[in-house]
């Protein structure tokens, strides 16, 4: 049997409904889990009872523990003959079960049993999992027959716990009850004793069904031997707006924080802004001063940059110290002189933290003040420093520019590039499609050889993108008509360069002339109206081509005719269409008003595997990046923490619900001054949330698994705790979005080919990488690549299997209907077959009822499935992706580069495997084509006898159907199709035999 048990401690209840004639109630609690029912004692005439009773349920199958549900029903006892008035219930999902070391009492609001029932109040429970073999499951006691059995009596229970460093905790409980009561004893070695607590007797009523017994050979798995959990877990954190329970915000007694930060936990910081100093003394022998400031609280120390030979420096740097980690009651701000061997002391200012004032936005920023520095003897000097010290939260304006105490590797932060640690917001550039059409050229003359007719082509270049036309017929006035599409970013930095070149040899091209068109001079359009052509003179170099005055003086030169336009009616894809976060066109004129607001609270993360080693210990330096639309956000980097806390909140405007929010976690490899530029930030995991799967107004608080697929297999590197809320500002506009096209209309009027879209998407990603790489701190290439996920289009045997499984799953419903119809036709269930006959007769007799019946049936199914609607947003499914049990060679092939770098024998093996799979696909495609060719052969006279038979049959059937009512024909056909097995033959029917004998084009295949 499994050693895992579910422990439930019933602590108390408050605010219960008063259901008896004395305006009170006598509550008791029934706990139900896995066909096991336990009952707490009855508290007579107490609407705010206190129990402190603990029960242990047997977990029969730990592998499905996350799918189980614990139910706690609260009733009021009246007498043994009356019904129990219902006071409320609580449902706790299995995904919320945690080890005992992490469990804490929680007040669950009581829910109604049905629409017409009433419920009020809260029930305080403590739910946990334990695998301690010394803890025995609760044993049922007989339910007394008399009302006196429910009277309360004083009982005591001593609980002693064994706490280990991991998540599981071994418990030893000894219950001492009065005589005439049943006592349970559990013995185990004691390490740490908890305070004495009073518990009540464990009562249990008989369940309506016998408990399920599962026999397991061998010992059961421990809590840490369970398979890895790749599912999403619902959490109930205490955020700024209150406790989140089931998507609802339960307000507490404390004053809520500002609504701007109601999706994150409030974090308090001590902010120190070092502005500047003046009239500092000279310390060096040369009569100069290289000042810098040290801000110190306990063991935390922040250091500003130093200035060379400056007695009036200006720093304007902010330091933030987490108030829950402060190790001293005093703040020291020291000014020092940078020296080669030992830095000299200049002066110091001390602050008592108890005197520091608090500031909460929307209060104005705190004005800095001048403070006179003291020497080591405490004497005031004439040189001063300007400081501002205040207590605030992450809602403060200085939060984004501050250097945090958890971002310091050691006591000296001078080797830290603080810019790479701060939270920032990025905006990707607005992308346009540039459509260029090369028409013709005139007077193309080769100066070196005027007698030779040139073979010219045009090279079109925009930034790093370059395409070329085909070779026309040799002529001095060539014509092309080729059209090209590029991606450009606004604000426009690159120009359109047209270069005419002469192909003189197989590997030799000589320039004829160049023309430069400024991007701002190109017209823009938002529809499919024709755009105008232009003539341009060719110059010898780009500098001459950009000289406007010289172009006006040219009397004779080679001319090029072209068309160019910026298409603003398209949406430029920079990510996969199915995972797009924005579908708006490039032109702002076509943008519609926003339909809602998306709010994201990045709470914290749990990193299971260290990403690097520092000072002989494994650690991680993590940050979070989220993308939606044109807005990218990056959280601050938390140094040396496997459980970082961010508590940062961001908002986006939503223009379409059929979009996806992408969040990724990375390990920072570029924060130290000694880090080289060749290092890459390693991804820890990714989360995608589709907005259309979210209920408006609900707060989704979940722990998402961070999964990364590597050549060694699927790894769960941690969990990311998020709070997401989608608020709709216009319900009618959002509902109308479901009737609108997904993409702008230009994608349907002048569609781009699939290959063209993929090429343009890669150009767009490269442009975004370049633009975001210029920011400070830069958003690096590996981050953009991982968020856009452009590698998903590459071949993968794993994805091929997963997509084929999805294909079969989609049609599994139709296959089930076909199997059910076979059972109807074979009369396996005569009652069902008879009912189908009756229904079929009604539909044929009244055909106008067919469509209403079908749509009514679908409506009823939809309403029935509302009870089972998904409660969690969808997440990356390891089983659906075939990532949990994939072949190592297939993974190695998936991570191979282009071109391959594997050994020839491995490539040969993979090629042969691909050939075998392709051969099966080829055979299936040929069989499908053969069936269609047989249909065509019915009237093609390829088989004259078969066609003659079919034509004669059609003529006879036409005459018969003309004189026979259609309803009669339909009834007879249906009855014949569902005829009894005694009227059937095992051999194929005549129509099937006739169809299989028809010829196909397979005979003509080589």
UniProtKB/Swiss-Prot annotation:
The keyword Repeat applies. Expressed in incipient leaf primordia and roots meristems. Observed in flowers. Keywords: Calcium, Cell membrane, Cytoplasm, Membrane, Metal-binding, Repeat, Transmembrane, Transmembrane helix. Its main location: membrane. It is found in: Cell membrane; Cytoplasm. Residues 135-156 are annotated as: Disordered. CDD domains: C2A_MCTP_PRT_plant, C2B_MCTP_PRT_plant, C2C_MCTP_PRT_plant, C2D_MCTP_PRT_plant. InterPro entries: C2_dom (IPR000008), C2_domain_sf (IPR035892), C2B_MCTP_PRT_plant (IPR047257), C2C_MCTP_PRT_plant (IPR047258), C2D_MCTP_PRT_plant (IPR047255), MCTP_C (IPR013583), QUIRKY-like (IPR047259). The keyword Repeat applies. GO terms for cellular component: cytosol; plasma membrane. Ca(2+) 2 binds at residues 284, 337, 339, 344. Its cofactor is Ca(2+). Residues 1-108, 251-371, 411-536, 579-704 form the C2 domain. The chain crosses the membrane at residues 842-862, 946-966. Disulfide bonds: none annotated. Pfam families: C2, PRT_C. One of its GO terms (molecular function) is metal ion binding. It comes from the Eukaryota. PROSITE patterns: C2 (PS50004). May function as a signaling molecule by regulating the trafficking of other regulators. Belongs to the MCTP family. This is Multiple C2 domain and transmembrane region protein 9. The gene is MCTP9.
